[in-house]
């Protein structure tokens, strides 16, 4: 019985993550059980005529259910909504507080977008449950937002139109892409109009952040602007040279069997430099991302992990910028970058 219930809870988690909504078909059930959580059953008043046993049993079941629901809310807030939707009050009779810890500790929680969270917050306020309703406003993870594009279950776009790319990226980034080792190899193979130096990935089943990967070679000006502290260490400790052009000339000199796949990863890009270095279109798309909104809510104002850079540690220094952008503006970019006039 427990196994079946836990599987139903996990199925509900996946459904809520996919739909990015907790209302719709479940609205009446959700309202009923949130009301139970936020408003304890009133004490039965004494009567001249004794109440039926079923009334006492029903009252006890509600009290028992509320205790279990609150136990889940306190210890597993990200499973709370799936739990109350799947487990009705009557079924809580067989649950014990100790079992809640044991059975739910391995369940994955819900991870909803900020827009969905705002909608749910507004829904809770309209119900006017009272002070305890504040508990229900913390059901969305306060941890760093993830995106399914970091896994394999994503749509991938790999061949961008270079003529369109100049509209979305700054001149500096466009030139960095054009002079990158990967792009130079494409040109040698007559891939002039399209490039795999610009790739995008989107989640299949929800509207989490999209990922943009740009092969930009090693442009010292880009690195110094976005990651000034990291650049100082790269140049002083690891001996990186400041000329990207000199590294590009070493492509043919590097023997294949000596190729080193390891890389340095730079995170915490300077936010104020993003509009200049990456361009205003990309900056707006980054601001729209769930990750950037989370960073802002958590007072990470001057730097962002929405922009990271991988640099190979040996020549030719190949660099890949990884950008987290909002879903809607990411879709707009993709429809332009990957639409070719034939």
UniProtKB/Swiss-Prot annotation:
Location, primary (coarse class): nucleus
Localization per record: Nucleus
Keyword set, alphabetical order: Nucleus
Region annotation (RNA recognition motif (RRM)-like domain) ranges: 151-181
Position of sequence motif Bipartite nuclear localization signal: 46-68
Keyword Kinase appears in the UniProt entry: no
Organism domain of life: Eukaryota
Cellular compartments per GO CC: nucleus
Function comment: Probably modulates the generation of the hypoxia-typic morphotype (called H-MORPH) with altered biofilm architecture that leads to increased host inflammation, rapid disease progression, and mortality in a murine model of invasive aspergillosis.
Family of the protein in this entry: Belongs to the hrmA family.
Notes on the domains: The N-terminal bipartite nuclear localization signalis required for nuclear localization and generation of the H-MORPH morphotype.
Protein name: Hypoxia responsive morphology factor C
Organism: Aspergillus fumigatus (strain CBS 144.89 / FGSC A1163 / CEA10) (Neosartorya fumigata)
Lineage of producing organism: Eukaryota, Fungi, Dikarya, Ascomycota, Pezizomycotina
């Amino acid at each position: 019985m427990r196994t079946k219930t836990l599987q139903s809870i996990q199925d509900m988690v996946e459904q809520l993550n996919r739909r990015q909504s907790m209302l719709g078909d479940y609205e009446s059930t959700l309202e009923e059980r949130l009301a139970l959580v936020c408003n304890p059953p009133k004490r039965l008043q004494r009567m001249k005529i004794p109440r039926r046993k079923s009334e006492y049993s029903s009252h006890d079941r509600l009290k028992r259910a509320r205790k279990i629901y609150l136990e889940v809310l306190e210890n597993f807030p990200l499973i709370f909504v799936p739990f109350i939707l799947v487990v009705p009050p009557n079924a809580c009779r067989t649950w014990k507080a100790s079992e809640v810890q044991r059975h739910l500790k391995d369940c994955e929680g819900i991870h909803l977008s900020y827009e969905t969270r705002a909608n749910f917050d507004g829904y809770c306020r309209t119900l006017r449950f009272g002070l305890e309703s504040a508990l229900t406003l913390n059901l969305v993870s306060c941890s760093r937002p993830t995106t399914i594009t970091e896994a394999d279950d994503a749509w991938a776009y790999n061949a961008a139109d270079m003529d369109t790319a100049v509209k979305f990226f700054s001149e500096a980034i466009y030139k960095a892409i054009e002079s990158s080792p990967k792009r130079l190899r494409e040109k040698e193979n007559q891939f002039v109009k399209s490039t795999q130096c610009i790739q995008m990935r989107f989640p299949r089943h929800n509207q989490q952040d999209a990922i943009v990967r740009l092969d930009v070679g090693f442009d010292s000006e880009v690195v110094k602007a976005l990651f000034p502290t990291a650049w100082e260490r790269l140049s002083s400790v690891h001996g990186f040279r400041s000329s990207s052009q000199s590294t590009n000339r070493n492509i043919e000199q590097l023997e294949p069997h000596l190729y080193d796949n390891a890389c340095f990863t730079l995170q915490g890009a300077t936010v104020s430099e993003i509009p200049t270095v990456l361009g205003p279109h990309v900056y707006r798309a980054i601001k729209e991302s769930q990750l950037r909104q989370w960073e802002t809510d958590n007072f990470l104002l001057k730097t962002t992990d929405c922009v990271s850079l991988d640099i190979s540690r040996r020549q030719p220094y190949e660099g890949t910028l990884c950008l987290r952008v909002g879903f809607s503006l990411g879709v707009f970019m993709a429809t332009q970058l990957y639409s070719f006039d034939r």
